[in-house]
Amino acid sequence: MAKVLVIKTSMMGANSISNVLNDKFMEYYKEKNPNDEFIYMNLNDEKMASITMTSHNMKEYFVAEYSDKYINQLKKVDKVVMSVPMTNFNVNAVTKNYLDHISVADKTFSYKYSKKGEAIGLLDHLSVQILTTQGAPLGWYPWGNHSEYLKGHWRFLGAKVADHILVDSVKIGENSKKTPQEIIEKFDGEIKKAAYSF
């Protein structure tokens, strides 16, 4: 039995395509793994995720309440399912703030035992499933690839990252007139396959 941390990040609530994607993935995951333990977290509800690192708060930024609490949570789970919409060509602010708070030298990565100078991720027990959405088709804006950023960041921390699911083009053409549920339905087979294998 695995412990699974399920993270939502969208500010759009019920109208969020990434939230619907997350729900659909978890529906299929639970079909295959009904006895797993699930912990749900919406970053919009976490004070930590609204705090951005600046020159004025460096001393307080990594206090236990905002950093160790979430690092320890990751150390106690086996899997992470994280859904993130694209916002202005990148991850949204709550996601960036979360990743900044959990990326701490000698807690989630370290250079101490590196032979070539590269960082060694310390969360190597984790498996991560990334679920992303974006308004434009993949490749329209080459500088904006939040899926690859998320994959790279989790791998930097040592996690094993499954092939991500990207639901793109959600604001283009006919998709702009569809409900989140209708958009996600087109990806149903891909979502089910990924959920069953994660």
Swiss-Prot record:
Reaction catalysed by this enzyme: 2 a quinone + NADH + H(+) = 2 a 1,4-benzosemiquinone + NAD(+); N,N-dimethyl-1,4-phenylenediamine + anthranilate + 2 NAD(+) = 2-(4-dimethylaminophenyl)diazenylbenzoate + 2 NADH + 2 H(+)
Top EC group: oxidoreductase
Keyword Flavoprotein appears in the UniProt entry: yes
Molecular function per GO: electron transfer activity; FMN binding; oxidoreductase activity, acting on NAD(P)H as acceptor; oxidoreductase activity, acting on NAD(P)H, quinone or similar compound as acceptor
Cofactor: binding details: Binds 1 FMN per subunit.
Positions that bind FMN: S10, S16, I17, S18
Transmembrane segments: none
InterPro entries: Flavodoxin_fold, Flavoprotein-like_sf, FMN-dep_NADH:Q_OxRdtase_AzoR1, NADH:quinone_OxRdtase_FMN_depd
EC number annotated for this UniProt entry: 1.6.5.-, 1.7.1.17
Keyword hit for Cell membrane: no
Pfam families with a match to the protein in the record: Flavodoxin_2
Domain of life where this protein originates: Bacteria
Sorted UniProt keywords: Flavoprotein, FMN, NAD, Oxidoreductase
Cofactor field: FMN
Record-stated family: Belongs to the azoreductase type 1 family.
Oligomer status and interactors: Homodimer.
Role according to the record: Quinone reductase that provides resistance to thiol-specific stress caused by electrophilic quinones. Also exhibits azoreductase activity. Catalyzes the reductive cleavage of the azo bond in aromatic azo compounds to the corresponding amines.
Protein name: FMN-dependent NADH:quinone oxidoreductase
Taxonomic lineage: Bacteria, Bacillati, Mycoplasmatota, Mycoplasmoidales, Metamycoplasmataceae
Gene this protein is translated from: azoR
